Amino acid sequence: MRKIALITGGSRGLGKHTALALATQGCDLILTYQQNRAAADEVVSAVRASGAQAVALPLDVGRSQDFAAFAARVAEVLPQQFGRTQFDFLVNNAGIGIHAFFADTSEAQFDQLMQIHLK
């Protein structure tokens, strides 16, 4: 049975490259994206071209109030797309960077960083 990985922030950067690498190792994937559906669809197409299954779902990891709805969506997708009820592992990759010196970082920027990375 193929393993299924859920990769947050899987539409670009490290998440994208992790998705592509796992696909070549025989993993099927659920990847998330925040805004750029087209980029996520490109990753899904590349994963499928390598012979793995993949689906992309929207998720803003900074909005913890949306997690229950996201979990419900994953529970729907797993049997529909993969014939399973659970995924095997999580790559918790989604995140942001504040490109400023700490002293120049606003409280709002710092709060957003903490919301996404730690909450």
Residue ranges and their predicted role:
Residues 1-30:
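Canonical Rossmann dinucleotide-binding motif of NAD(H)/NADP(H)-dependent dehydrogenases/reductases
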Residues 4-7, 87-91:
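Conserved hydrophobic beta-strands of the Rossmann-like cofactor-binding core
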Residues 25-42:
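Conserved glycine-rich Rossmann-like NAD(P)H-binding loop of the short-chain dehydrogenase/reductase
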Residues 37, 58-73, 107:
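The beta1-alpha1 cofactor-binding region of Rossmann-like NAD(H)/NADP(H)-dependent oxidoreductases
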Residues 54-56:
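Hydrophobic/aromatic anchor residues within beta-strands of the central parallel beta-sheet
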Residues 87, 101-102, 106-114:
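Substrate-binding pocket helix/loop in short-chain dehydrogenase/reductase
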Residues 93-98:
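Conserved NAD(P)H cofactor-binding loop of Rossmann-fold oxidoreductase domains
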